[in-house]
């Protein structure tokens, strides 16, 4: 079984934010695979299904980004899974808008949602699918970063991200069916 967690903030006011591309990707993946987020469990909205022979659970934590680890920890215990069984879909400021990167482990890279997961589950050894949202500009400071990640995509950037979300959903399917090495070779830009 694989547990796929999309990171984001709950609520309609956040739905189009850069910080919510994890939720957006999971919604697309769920739709393409006929999975509904029809359950509330472990501080998350969840849905389950199968990809080939692999059972999967999709989860969107409803704790707000900075407390995502609480939901992930509960989900791991509920389904009796280990960190090696999870895939976290997240936004990444350090990647240009629309770029994808799959990797196992590593630091949180300043991402508070990932930091919360690492703290609450006690390891950084889980797969991440990062979707680039770009930096606000070369002069960024804390306030500009917050405004950027909580801002919505505009115009041309929205088109780039729509394409990236579609590719990220493909990357998830490849990751589940063919493994990290194959998916990384195919989708890391």
Swiss-Prot record:
Any one Gene Ontology cellular component term annotated for this protein: cytoplasm
InterPro entries attached to this UniProt entry: Pept_tRNA_hydro (IPR001328), Pept_tRNA_hydro_sf (IPR036416)
Subcellular location: Cytoplasm
Superkingdom assignment: Bacteria
Annotated residues for binding of tRNA: 14, 64, 66, 112
UniProt site positions, description: Discriminates between blocked and unblocked aminoacyl-tRNA: 9
Main location as per UniProt: cytoplasm
Protein name: Peptidyl-tRNA hydrolase
Organism lineage string: Bacteria, Bacillati, Chloroflexota, Dehalococcoidia, Dehalococcoidales
């Amino acid at each position: 079984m694989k547990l796929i967690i999309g990171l984001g903030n709950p609520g309609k006011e956040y739905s189009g934010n850069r910080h919510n591309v994890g939720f957006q990707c999971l919604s697309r993946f769920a739709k393409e695979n006929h999975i509904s987020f029809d359950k509330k469990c472990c501080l998350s909205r969840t849905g389950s299904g199968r990809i080939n022979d692999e059972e999967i659970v999709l989860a969107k934590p409803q704790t707000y980004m900075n407390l995502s680890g609480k939901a992930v920890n509960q989900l791991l215990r509920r389904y009796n899974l280990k960190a090696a069984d999870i895939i976290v879909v997240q936004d990444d400021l350090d990647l240009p808008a629309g770029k994808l990167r799959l990797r196992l482990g590593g630091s949180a890279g300043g991402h508070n949602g990932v930091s919360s997961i690492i703290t609450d589950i006690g390891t950084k050894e889980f797969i991440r699918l990062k979707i680039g949202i770009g930096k606000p500009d070369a002069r960024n400071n804390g306030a500009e970063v917050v405004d950027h990640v909580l801002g919505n995509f505009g115009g041309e950037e929205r088109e780039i991200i729509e394409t990236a979300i579609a590719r990220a959903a493909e990357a998830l399917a490849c990751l589940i069916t063919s493994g990290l090495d194959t998916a990384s070779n195919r989708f890391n830009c």
